[in-house]
């Protein structure tokens, strides 16, 4: 089929033979996209020529990454779509075949404006198909909280239809802001895909949703589940039911019942009257555990060799290696699983790095809270943030709370197992912007083990309060709560999706959002 002039990235190329383009696999893919367009039009997802669909040609003889791409055009009535309307592209997005122009009143053929966004899903996630829907529920769900950067839901049966999720899991869909032109969304969608490795969809506020899957069946199934869940969210909102918690109780019920809340502070977020300082844990308190385990830890693990190799002779890395050697020698004496000897420097750079990588990978796998590991991770993450390969994630109630505490004159500090540098990087590069202006200081394991009472005494001495009771500590870890309480801190335990269960009769006040404080 000859090209009739297309506005996509590249002109028609000759990288695939005419015979293959006219062959059975490509023909079936064209017909499939046309059929899906008609089906989704009936669903209300692609009305008014909006929305688009693309699939990879199903040819088992060709690796998925190299398969041709079939993509629906722009400006064509989806309910009247036929196979001949489709564009066929190479795996890199180069157009190989374009539709023939039709007589007036049909518009000249034009490749979908979604093409660069579709290519991001193909290249970054190895997708087999991508669906862009303008379904009403995908727009309204993003309007319920105009400031939210994520959509969250848990304990709904249809969550099981989303890849990698179960009934009890928390579904998280990143939300990016709309732009006047579709192609202008490319960078923000790319950043969201990178920041949320478990996600198979991105919502565009007041616009729609992009959904991808390993195959057209998987993408279609997930798209149907997403639309169901977003529609359920809207209906639950109308009923005053909270879709973000396992109990699905009344929205803000806890907030309404607590007399501690102040009408002067929007959304609560006011510390107890006696508190002069708030000390926050990160993982499971300000930030989802999944972000740390699924993004931060894997990034450090996957980049430790490159980091050590490229910075081996720097003073900073020499110090990191010195601390690791001391820790590993101690681990070997104590029979710690996964510890392997580190050869002397005379053995050569490569041998030293190989042994260090093996030890670090073992430490990360065991989630050890030790200073040498945390310091090295912080230096690796710094590079990730500088390269924009990492972006900090916090729960949506956190920025509001930090701002309100700051406005009320309450000083806020962080106490985390991660290094102080890593803490600053995370809060300085969040999806909500730089939050460090609301923080007064940072504590890490150099202050002491977070499960030991002595550590909280050291924190209280550093903060200069008259009494430890003037410090409110919020954490998700029971043992940390006990240690802080034994020092005299006021303590609240954070209940977030994915956090470890608490023992029965633990005796601590719990919250699911900072808005309850």
UniProtKB/Swiss-Prot annotation:
Binds 1 zinc ion per subunit. This is Probable bifunctional methylthioribulose-1-phosphate dehydratase/enolase-phosphatase E1. Residues 278-517 are annotated as: Enolase-phosphatase E1. The active site is at 157 (proton donor/acceptor). Substrate 2 binds at residues 416-417, 450. Residues 1-242 are annotated as: Methylthioribulose-1-phosphate dehydratase. Substrate 1 binds at residue 114.
């Amino acid at each position: 089929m000859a090209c009739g002039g297309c506005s996509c990235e590249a002109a028609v190329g000759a990288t695939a033979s005419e015979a293959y383009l006219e062959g059975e696999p490509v023909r079936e893919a064209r017909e499939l996209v046309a059929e899906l367009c008609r089906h989704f039009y009936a669903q209300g997802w692609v009305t008014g020529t909006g929305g688009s669909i693309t699939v990879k040609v199903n040819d088992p003889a060709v690796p998925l990454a190299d398969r041709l791409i079939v993509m629906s055009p722009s400006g064509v009535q989806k309910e009247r779509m036929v196979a001949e309307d489709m564009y066929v592209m190479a795996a890199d997005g180069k157009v190989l075949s374009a539709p023939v122009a039709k007589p007036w009143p049909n518009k000249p053929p034009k490749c979908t404006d979604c093409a660069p966004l579709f290519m991001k899903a193909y290249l970054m996630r190895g997708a087999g198909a991508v669906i862009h829907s303008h379904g009403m529920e995908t727009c309204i769900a993003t309007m319920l909280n105009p400031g939210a950067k994520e959509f969250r839901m848990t304990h709904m049966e249809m969550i099981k239809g989303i890849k990698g999720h179960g009934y009890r899991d928390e579904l998280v869909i990143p939300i990016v802001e709309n732009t006047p032109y579709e192609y202008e969304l490319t960078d923000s969608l790319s950043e969201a895909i990178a920041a949320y490795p478990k996600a198979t969809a991105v919502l565009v506020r007041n616009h729609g949703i992009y959904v991808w899957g390993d195959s057209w069946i998987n993408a279609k199934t997930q798209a149907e589940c997403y639309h169901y869940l977003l529609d359920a969210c809207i209906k639950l909102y109308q009923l005053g039911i909270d879709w973000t918690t396992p109990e699905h109780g009344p929205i803000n019920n806890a907030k309404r019942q607590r007399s501690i809340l102040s009408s002067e502070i929007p959304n609560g977020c006011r510390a107890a009257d006696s508190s002069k300082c708030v000390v926050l844990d990160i993982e499971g308190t300000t930030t989802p555990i999944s972000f740390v385990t699924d993004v931060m830890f894997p990034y450090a693990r996957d980049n430790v060799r490159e980091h050590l190799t490229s910075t081996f002779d720097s003073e900073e890395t020499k110090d990191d290696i010195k601390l690791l050697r001391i820790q590993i020698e101690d681990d070997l004496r104590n029979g710690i699983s996964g510890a392997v000897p580190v050869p002397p420097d005379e053995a050569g750079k490569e041998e030293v790095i190989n042994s260090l990588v093996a030890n670090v990978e073992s430490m990360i796998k065991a989630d050890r809270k030790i200073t040498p590991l945390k310091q090295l991770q912080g230096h690796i993450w710094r590079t990730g943030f500088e390269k924009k390969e990492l972006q900090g994630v916090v729960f949506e109630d956190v920025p509001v709370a930090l701002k309100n505490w700051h406005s009320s004159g309450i000083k806020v500090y962080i106490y985390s197992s991660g290094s102080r540098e890593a803490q600053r990087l995370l809060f300085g590069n969040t999806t909500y912007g730089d939050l460090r202006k609301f923080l007064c200081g940072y504590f890490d394991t150099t202050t002491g083990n977070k499960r030991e009472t002595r550590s909280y005494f050291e924190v209280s001495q550093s903060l200069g309060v008259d009494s430890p009771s003037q410090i409110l500590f919020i954490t998700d870890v029971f043992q940390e709560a006990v240690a802080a309480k034994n020092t005299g801190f006021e303590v609240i335990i954070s209940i977030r999706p994915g956090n470890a269960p608490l023992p029965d009769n633990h005796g601590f006040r719990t919250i699911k959002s900072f808005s309850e404080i």
